[in-house]
Amino acid sequence: MLSAERGAAVNTLESYRRDLEDFAEFAGANGTTLLGANTETITAYLGDLTARGFAASSQARRLSALRQFYKHLYADGLRGDDPTRAVLAPKKRATLPKVLSVEDVDLLLKTAEAEAQTGGETPAAALRTRRLHTLLEVLYATGLRVSELVSLPLSAALRDERLITVSGKGGKERAVPLSPAARTAMRAYVAERQALEGAKSKGQMGSRWLFPSHGESGHFTRQAFARDLKALAARAGLDPSLLSPHVLRHAFASHLLQNGADLRVVQQLLGHADISTTQIYTHVLDERLRALVEAHHPLAGGT
């Protein structure tokens, strides 16, 4: 069946055989057979796999074997239906990338700040170092999506306010606070940009974007920011493979929760429409609760 039509490797065929045998054993224990099993039996089997500790990816592989099997039975006229059609695939648990420590983020920011203060060989190079420092300070201060960050309007920096208004997914606006460090970096960047652009256009800044570029969008791109961030990480002595703008957004949320922020507040800052999206960070809350119990419970130390 599978080998004839798909040229499957020997190991793959052996895996499918074991998966089908395991399901056949479950079906037999529940009063049916491999050939006669219905949708309810297959759904119950997935529940049994969960109870036995199988990961969602392993369950999905076994369901795939069953789908192939019943698809061929139906196509060959050996069954009048395919009982797997109504079975939902197991959902994989949302996972977070490795959370950067506060120390790693601090090292990254200090490296960017030092490079911004040193400047570059040309005014344009100096502006690029200011831009990268500002991007990092604003990202870690606000937790913006990278698409929101690179498309900030110039007006966000000119108001010099403690809050900036961000247009997020679906055009929904939210106000997020800026840290003093982010405001300082932003002012220094805008001043350097004014000096560079003003010399070319009689004091006027030509772009409405805070981080302009010559590309089609008119503003700095996510890809360019990610590239510059990885290069900075290498110069700071960090593993570039662990760094991305999205990882810094995760660090923002995780560090807030580690320091006692409410999950609902973090939801609002991140711009999540549904609290369930923010709940992927509950592992941070679990760790904080465990530390609190160990620190304050009278028997936590085993005495």
Model-derived features with residue positions:
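Conserved catalytic core of the tyrosine transesterase superfamily
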Residues: 1-303
